[in-house]
Amino acid sequence: MNSCFGPRSQDLVTLRQFDRLEDVPDASRYFVLVEEHPDSINDPTFFTTFQGANGWVDVPASHHERACNFLFADAHVETHPWQSARTVIPVRFQFPILSGTAKDPDFRWTYERTSIAGR
C-alpha cells in the first residue's frame, strides 16, 4: 500500500498524506496499491521517497513481462511497463535490494503518482 495513504507516517517529510479519499485532489493520478518486489518487502507500506543517491526505498515488482500493476484511488488499474533494465530485478530472496536513482525514468513515473508536495 502506498505509504501516503492511511495513517500518518513519520517518514513522510516532503509528500502529503491522504487520510481520506476526499483528500486526494485527482484520484485518477495517485496509486493506492502496487505490487512490491519480493526482495523489497520489509513492512506493510510502499515508500517512494528519495534516499540519498538511491531513488528507491521500496522497489516495485516486474512480474508481468517487465511491468507492474498499480491500483489508483479512482479504482482503475494500470499495468505500467518499465523503461529501465535497472527496475527489472530478478527475485533472489535477499534483502535489502537497491536499484535505480532519482533520475531513473521509472522512479520518476512512480514518484509523480505517489502524492503531491507538502504535508
What are the residue ranges of the model-derived segments?
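Short, well-structured segments within or immediately adjacent to enzyme catalytic domains
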Residues: 1-119
